[in-house]
Amino acid sequence: MSYIKMKDNCRNFSLSKWQDTRKPWLILIIVTIGLTCIAHFLFQEYLFMKPCEQCVYIRFDMLVMAIGGMIALINPANNIIKIFSYSLAFYGIWLGLEHCLTLNHIHEVVHSENPFAGVDGCREIPIYPFNLPLYKWAPSWFLPTGECGMDTPVVPENAYNHLNAFQKFFIGTPPDFENGLYSNGWYLIPSLKFMNMAICCLIAFLCCFVVLFAMFIAYVLDKNKPNAKIFALVIVALVLVLKFIGESKNPNQNIASLNQVVLRYS
């Protein structure tokens, strides 16, 4: 009976109908906010891994996607709601892919034998889209305090005597902190230095893109939604507008050269 019921459910499943429900958008919110909270509370606050410029940008990208999901929860079947929810979700993914690739490039350069090749710089004061001063509104979340490409734990001396066994397992024991799982930085498999944080975040953004794009195509091709193609064009246009109008360039911002950062570790 359970097999027959499962077979009927598969037959009745429609991606177009599913994207009209709150479930996929709720999953998107849980994933993006969950990853952001893990980065902040676990890695930054608990394991003393300070976020760099690209790291806080990735948090912003996740937040943009989550806001898109929250808007969709109002009425996911409404076309006007879809315009804002899909646009923000795709916009956040676009930014996220760019920032992950940049972070991975910086990580590879900093850990290579020639750390001065191909790196422009790392800002101490971040520049967010539309010049949003997020680093002022929520500095603990959106102000970079770490070095570009260096995600090793930086434990303050006043915390040496207060580390528990769980923390020591990941960051090591004082004063050298060389025997922890993440003493050489965060990797999915630390012993092999396999898949750094940038690559894992990149995969997360790609997975979100694949699911959302499949939902978007199902919405466009739904024969019961004759105006879907028009709304889809509006969504694409809005994503482009957000991307290119949101780009902010302020030459007066304080910029710290990444070459100076690398000199500290050379």
Curated annotation (Swiss-Prot):
Disulfide bonds: C52-C55, C122-C148
Lipid bilayer topology: Multi-pass membrane protein
Protein localization: Cell inner membrane
A cellular component term, taken from the record's GO annotations: plasma membrane
Transmembrane segments: 24-44, 61-81, 83-103, 201-221, 226-246
Single GO term (MF): protein-disulfide reductase activity
Keywords for this protein: Cell inner membrane, Cell membrane, Disulfide bond, Electron transport, Membrane, Oxidoreductase, Redox-active center, Transmembrane, Transmembrane helix, Transport
A Pfam family of this chain: DsbB
Oxidoreductase found in the keyword field: yes
GO terms under biological process: protein folding
InterPro entries assigned: DiS_bond_form_DsbB/BdbC, DsbB, DsbB-like_sf
Lineage: superkingdom: Bacteria
Keyword Electron transport listed: yes
Family (UniProt): Belongs to the DsbB family. DsbI subfamily.
Function comment: Required for disulfide bond formation in some proteins. Part of a redox system composed of DsbI and DsbL that mediates formation of an essential disulfide bond in AssT.
Protein name: Putative protein-disulfide oxidoreductase DsbI
